[in-house]
Amino acid sequence: MFVDQVKIYVKGGDGGNGMVAYRREKYVPKGGPAGGDGGKGADVVFVVEEGLRTLMDFRYQRHFKADRGQHGMSKGQHGRKSEDLIVKVPPGTVVKDEKTGQILADLVTHGQTAVIAKGGRGGRGNSRFATATNPAPEIAENGEPGQERDVILELKVLADVGLVGFPSVGKSTLLSVVSSARPKIAEYHFTTIVPNLGVVETGDNRSFVMADLPGLIEGAHAGVGLGHQFLRHIERTRVIVHVIDMSGLEGRDPYEDYVTINNELKEYNLRLTERPQVVVANKMDMPDAEENLQAFKEKVGDEVKIFPISAVTRQGVRDLLFEVANLIETTPEFPIHEVADESDTSVMYKFDTEGVKFEITRESDGTFVISGYDIEKTFKMTDFSRDESVRRFARQMRGMGIDEALRARGAKDGDIVKILEYEFEFID
């Protein structure tokens, strides 16, 4: 089974906690603070592995959580940074943020990497907070939380050639004849619901990958039937082989099929029409095929080169493969997203934290709820088991303008204020 889209959860490792410690050595009566910083949490890094062909492995493991950094230690020793969590993906994987739809990475070449979830920085130890007025601070930070998100992985088939055409025109049969692929073949529509890949050898030391793509019907660009699944897989192909049934047994007109398929390709993505297209008249071994072919040629004109074949008897297949191989050699790849520096195999990760620093809402019971990236991060990095840390957090809230905003919303002494799952009283 070919899995081409899957949703997974990734979380960068939390930073290690900073430590509160003091030098306790003989002959050093006033050693001062010596708590080390926590280590950085591990990133979740996606790496392209050319040996992979599907996203099947992600059906069995959908959660990837990187290790947190080591906690700070005494004697000013910093915690160790955790090793990044490496997640291998097949070439052609597009990674999207499930919430925003933003494309985080388009991974094509072997060894290409992208950081999908950043690990948090380590919390600072108490030696970082020493000042002239507070030479022995009882204060240290918790590690910064690692970023977490749900992402959608989409696999684009990295085939050189894509077979397109209406269902049951003989695409699966053709692929099985010219390669070692063994797609399921039957005489009903939508037999092929996932792409089948096959390596084709032309006999003159040339080879290419051909994909028998899911059947296409009118309205595919709008998502009708299997449309979007089909069109996602054809975006990366360099040559399109358009297979048309000349037998007439399905009751459809070959020319109307030809026009409909091309309209769908044009509607979905204009760049699809830039690819060279080879028109294949299949099922020429059937009784009315020759007559239908002549009528088809009259309608399309002389500018369209047509290859009459029979996938069953292999008539004309050899000439078709030579033509396709020639086109591949002269046709460049069509990347979906332009890359500024093709020599760089890494993807720059940008995490936008701009926006509202905090937001205050009020629940039906009168509780004030404070939310926002900055305040929640500050809250998580505060060690509430130490009084100095609590006082520092209160100062940080005042500095962000939260106290003033609460008063403006009508908060009074004793009112309940909630951040994440924690509650405390407002003191004016």
UniProtKB/Swiss-Prot annotation:
GTP binds at residues 165-172, 190-194, 212-215, 282-285, 310-312. It is found in: Cytoplasm. Signal peptide: none annotated. Residues 159-329 form the OBG-type G domain. This is GTPase Obg. Keywords: Cytoplasm, GTP-binding, Hydrolase, Magnesium, Metal-binding, Nucleotide-binding. Residues 1-158 form the Obg domain. An essential GTPase which binds GTP, GDP and possibly (p)ppGpp with moderate affinity, with high nucleotide exchange rates and a fairly low GTP hydrolysis rate. Plays a role in control of the cell cycle, stress response, ribosome biogenesis and in those bacteria that undergo differentiation, in morphogenesis control. GO terms for molecular function: GTP binding; GTPase activity; magnesium ion binding. Its cofactor is Mg(2+). Its EC number is 3.6.5.-. It holds the Pfam family DUF1967. One of its GO terms (cellular component) is cytoplasm. It is an enzyme of class 3 (hydrolase). Its main location: cytoplasm. Mg(2+) binds at residues 172, 192. It comes from Bacillus cereus (strain AH187). Transmembrane segments: none annotated. GO terms for biological process: ribosome biogenesis. Belongs to the TRAFAC class OBG-HflX-like GTPase superfamily. OBG GTPase family. CDD domains: Obg. Monomer. The lineage of its organism: Bacteria, Bacillati, Bacillota, Bacilli, Bacillales. It comes from the Bacteria. Residues 350-428 form the OCT domain.
